[in-house]
Amino acid sequence: MAKKKIEAIIKLQVAAGKANPSPPIGPALGQHGVNIMGFCKEFNAKTQGMEPGMPIPVEISVYSDRSFTFEMKTPPASYLIKKAINVKSGSSKPSKEFIGTITRAQLEEIAKVKDPDLTAADLDAAVRIIAGSARSMGVKVEGV
C-alpha cells in the first residue's frame, strides 16, 4: 500500500472532552476538508479519562484523501504549574511580583507528566526546564 501524502499539519489546543465544531476547531479543520464531527468524537473519546477542560495540545495530520490522524501531547507546563499552586494566572511582573511558591517535589511530578514531550536527558534536567517555566510565570522555586 502506498503511503498517503500529508497535505497539512494543524496544531491546536483543545480542552479535554470538550471538542466541538465551533471555533477554533471547526474553521481550522473545515478549510482542509476534514470531517469535523469525526475528529471531535474521536478526540473526546480519547480524552474521556482526563480532567475535563484540561488544555491538550493536538497535532492533526491531514492527508490528500481528506482523512486524518492526530497525536495528543501533554498539557502545557504553565497549566500544570498553575494547577499545582492553585492560581488562575501568572504574574504580570514575573521577576518582581511572585504569585506563589512551588517545591522540588511538585516540579518533579510535573516533569514526570511532561517527560514524553521534553528533550531532557534525565529527570533533573526536566525539573530545571519546568523550574524555568515557573520562574517566567512569577512563581518562586524552592529546592532547585
Curated annotation (Swiss-Prot):
PROSITE patterns named among the record's database cross-references: RIBOSOMAL_L11
RNA-binding among keywords: yes
User: What are its GO cellular component terms?
Assistant: cytosolic large ribosomal subunit
Gene3D superfamilies cross-referenced by the UniProt entry: Ribosomal protein L11, C-terminal domain, Ribosomal protein L11/L12, N-terminal domain
For this UniProt record, give its keywords in alphabetical order, as a comma-separated list. Answer: Methylation, Ribonucleoprotein, Ribosomal protein, RNA-binding, rRNA-binding
GO molecular function annotations of the record: large ribosomal subunit rRNA binding; structural constituent of ribosome
Subunit structure comment from the entry: Part of the ribosomal stalk of the 50S ribosomal subunit. Interacts with L10 and the large rRNA to form the base of the stalk. L10 forms an elongated spine to which L12 dimers bind in a sequential fashion forming a multimeric L10(L12)X complex.
Q: Which NCBIfam families does the protein's record reference?
A: L11_bact (TIGR01632)
Family to which the UniProt record says this protein belongs: Belongs to the universal ribosomal protein uL11 family.
Q: What is this protein called?
A: Large ribosomal subunit protein uL11
The scientific name of the source species is: Francisella tularensis subsp. holarctica (strain LVS)
Q: Which gene encodes it?
A: rplK
